[in-house]
Amino acid sequence: LTVTDEALGEKNLAALQDYCREAEPYTVLLPSACAISSQLLPEAALLFDQETWLQNAAAALSPLCREVLNAYPLLEENGDSRLFYRTDSRPTQLTGYLLYQALGQALDYFPYAKDSFSNTPLRYDCTGDLYARWSYDKVRADVVTALLPLEDSRSYTITHTAADGTVTRWNTLYPLEGTAEIDCILGGPAAIIAVTAEGSIPRSLLILGDENALCVIPYLALHYDRITYVDVTRCSEEQLAAIAGAEYSRTLLLYGAPTLLNTDLTAGLTALTQS
């Protein structure tokens, strides 16, 4: 992880604090793959100290949130597992399951045991956003898998809404048609992703976050019949105003360190805070 302007991370943190004062959300802070797998990198590699930064960020947000989960220790403890893809910066569905387990008490559900799921391949030979950065061609492509419930009578609908209002729908959490590569998880990133799970408990969850959040949403849909994921950097002002005016049973913030440190979230978070 390269950080070009450390001041941006502090600005984002301040904007998150302002939002948390208003919304009192639950919050998850996620490290990137290089922080968890630093032992695999050359000794000369200069790495930003994500561990300390996330600790400080969690300490700053904790007084303003119902609960803050710094996921660094959790992922470090499970570092021998495939938590991130080889060729894409997104976390795998196994990381999603670990977060799902950790969030049970905060989001008021009893997590299903891992033996209630089947590890099922969805797509082979996938390459993501990191593939072109490798200086050699010996990096193996990824297999995208999902932990699918062994028994699940729910029916699911995903609705993607782009900033210009364009809408795309699927009747599955893992659409293979109309998607490419790793985007078969919830159809990939979008400004707004609305998930309905007919048969789950009738309550709603708002998730403000980045594409890291997509790995945990399928599990949360086992316990919430309406989940709305929002990427504030992709939304229009009108969309943010509509989100701010809606009511949800719970609100979750889920951001990865690369987004917090290198992507300006301030305008979107401020729009939600002031609406």
Task: Give the residues covered by each predicted segment.
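Extracellular glycan-modifying ectodomains
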Residues: 1-275
